[in-house]
């Protein structure tokens, strides 16, 4: 169970075998997320449920989000494509969101006019 976890570095689950609940509700991925070759044996992985989707950073190269599990895995991760304003296309699990970890700068206060 990875609910509410924050992966501030690369999250590499490639070739991992999951035999229990695998939940990523409200999990934040600041960098790469790699599930290539992962094997989900009994229970489908959950990345989103109602308002509790995982978050993926738009500052990461879209190619570094990999959700293609092992071809022999009985369960998989259902992806969707999301296009951002600059035209980049991200493939992330259905129901998840992209976010920008660098907040916009606060507006400067206006100089008083005389």
Which residues make up each language-model segment?
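N-terminal leader/targeting and pre-domain segments
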Residues: 1-114
């Amino acid at each position: 169970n990875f609910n509410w976890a924050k992966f501030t570095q690369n999250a590499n689950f490639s070739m991992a075998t999951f035999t229990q609940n695998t939940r990523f509700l409200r999990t934040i991925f600041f960098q790469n997320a790699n599930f290539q070759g992962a094997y989900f044996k009994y229970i489908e992985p959950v990345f989103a449920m109602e308002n509790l989707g995982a978050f993926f950073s738009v500052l990461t190269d879209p190619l570094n989000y990999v959700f293609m599990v092992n071809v022999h895995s009985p369960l998989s991760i259902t992806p969707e494509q999301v296009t951002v304003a600059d035209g980049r296309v991200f493939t992330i699990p259905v129901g998840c969101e992209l976010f920008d970890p660098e907040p916009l700068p606060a507006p400067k206060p206006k100089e008083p006019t005389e």
